A protein has these predicted regions:
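Extreme N-terminal "head/tail" segments of very large remodeling/mechanoenzyme assemblies
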Residues: 1-183
């Protein structure tokens, strides 16, 4: 029997699950493929305003929360400045402009049909087993509403290569992508 305050086991003996990487493709201001490696001992996300800190956290929230319950850019939301949503992240919206008719509209990095991928890779500390959470989102060039966003979510018991996902999803044909994910045991 253990004394009060004494642990029954050390944390080194427990197989914990820790976030090890966040990968985004065409998410917010991150155009193309970007990966953030997370140190299992801890990672500090810091930087100037507009450097992408909230953008990375919001990518994680997109995978971890039900779509109807995601609140983006909570730091700005406290100041009533929250103007981010799933479509604005997919489009890479930044600022606004006035169009030829005098209407204010968003400025976007990606106006065309676009695919966005978010991957959170988790790793067990002792066994080194991996789990990948995936979110794949795509919209047509004329889409501006949340209801227009097509979504595919997957949980895989192995790391999944985002470049391979994109290759399977060329021409916005979802069938080869779904076949690829089904072929991965446990996805």
């Amino acid at each position: 029997m253990s004394k009060q305050g004494e642990l029954l086991f050390s944390y080194d003996e427990v197989d914990q699950v820790k976030l090890s990487k966040v990968t985004v493709y065409n998410w917010g201001s991150f155009n193309g493929l970007h990966t953030l490696n997370i140190d299992p001992e801890g990672t500090l996300i810091t930087g100037e305003n507009g450097s992408g800190k909230s953008t990375i956290i919001d990518a994680l929230m997109t995978l971890l929360r039900p779509a109807s319950r995601v609140s983006y850019n909570l730091a700005a939301a406290q100041e009533k400045k929250n103007d981010r949503n799933l479509v604005s992240y997919i489009r890479g919206s930044f600022g606004s402009m006035v169009d030829d008719e005098g209407n204010q509209t968003s400025r976007n990095l990606r106006e065309q049909a676009v695919v966005t991928v978010i991957k959170a890779l988790y790793e067990y500390t002792a066994s080194k087993q991996q789990v990948a959470l995936l979110g794949i989102f795509y919209i047509n060039s004329d889409s501006t509403a949340y209801s227009d966003v097509k979504k595919i979510y997957s949980v895989c018991p192995v790391d999944v290569d985002v470049k391979e996902l994109l290759f399977r999803f060329k021409n916005f044909d979802v069938r080869p992508l779904k076949e690829y994910l089904k072929a991965i045991e446990g996805c």
